[in-house]
Amino acid sequence: RALAQRGYLYSSSLFPSPPYMLAKWGVMASMLLRGKRSQAIWGNPSMMFASRSPHHRRSVLEMPITVLPGIRFPLIGTTLALMGTQGYRVARPLLKQAHFLNLEFHGIDLIDLEQDGIDQTLLAQRDLRISLHSKLETFSMVLEDVAQGWDVQTLEELAPKFKGPRAR
């Protein structure tokens, strides 16, 4: 409701991925057991099994982050970096079954710890151990596939065109 009241047409906060949510909760629980607090949000368990397709929730269009069909493995910058080109080649046939893609990347996906002189304590985050060169090779492969297989639009461009089902 808050988004609709502020005039937003869409949201992209839904991440329907059991593997991601279970891993996230495992990390957060481990931190709690060690006396540390995470700033991450636990999230609603029902999110894991929500629709992978765009749909209306109240008066706002929800455009979920892409997960692979069937296995619901998350396809975001972090996991693509960890997969590398070999892993992406394995996932590619599943991705081609998806009729909607919402690929999420963050600025941190383009960091190279050595080149950028980032604090070595961040090596605890596995995707930061991967060179920028390797990440760019994987991201380029993915984005070339996307450009060839889908009509590329921003969510802002797509939202007003969507005519799918409305949830009450």
Describe each model-derived feature in a short phrase.
Residues Y10, G77, A81-R168:
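C-terminal domain-boundary segment and adjacent tail
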